[in-house]
Amino acid sequence: MRTGGSMGAVDVQARNNVRIAGVEGGPTIMLAHGFGCDQNLWRLVEARLASSFRLILFDHVGCGASDPSAWDPQRYESLQGYADDILGIVREFDLRDLIFVGHSVAAMMGVLVVATDPSRFARLVLLTPSPCYIDHGDYRGGFSRRDIDELLDSLESNYLGWSRSMAPVIMGAPDQPELADELTDSFCRTDPACARVFARTTFLSDNRADLARVSVPTLVIECAHDTLAPRQVGAYVQQHIDGSELVTLDSTGHCPQLSAPDVTAQAIAAFAGAT
């Protein structure tokens, strides 16, 4: 499928490795992955939703099986570049009444796409979101600017080493070490040059002001113990999106779609209106 846009004529399906699964004619859910991952990290939730929903999965450019030739470091130094890609998918496949589920940094991409074109979206689910990782005044994102600079310096100087050390911290499921191994493998499959740009975009973005632009029913899903998105961040997001709901999973880590797929899928399905 080809479409016009700021990137010129592009094959949207190939660019983002778009895949459609689940029940034709069911409510449509788009599952968007976060930094260093690809759509495969949704597989456990996908299996639990596929009998009731039509599912749209994809890889961000620079990740998974996306088209390497589509990579543009200037475009993707802003979350808006990723958000524009998502809107391109939505328009190319003429998706309407869409339930968008964004994990981690993709949650803020969801905020941007819904703010840009709310007519296409019925609901928004933000899974372990953070609008800003860096502390600012009374806002507590969980990290100082120095923390983030050190994290990015480590990533840029030794990406593979960073991946092996950070994956267990991000996954936060010490009783399931195989999940940290999987996340490490996912990080290591990502081109380091792309990962460096995506990491800076992820950890240096500040989307707090964009939360007020969301005008569709929104569910915020947080974990009880999450190093990257602590409880006060989930509360902040819920308080700054008018009418939104907050669900706290009795789970540890930043990736409950892997570590707690049952309750994650249940929360998404209940909000999305499975019958």
Q: Where would I find each of the regions flagged by the language model?
A:
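Catalytic active-site module of serine/aspartate enzymes centered on a nucleophile-bearing elbow/loop
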Residues: S244-T275
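Active-site loop/oxyanion-hole signature of alpha/beta-hydrolase fold enzymes
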Residues: D11-A14, A47, H60-V105, Q266
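Conserved alpha/beta-hydrolase catalytic His-Asp/Glu region
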Residues: D135, Y139-F143, S154-A212
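Conserved alpha/beta-hydrolase "nucleophile elbow" surrounding the catalytic nucleophile
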Residues: H33-F35, L98, G102-S104, C223
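Acidic catalytic loop of the alpha/beta-hydrolase fold
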Residues: H225-A229
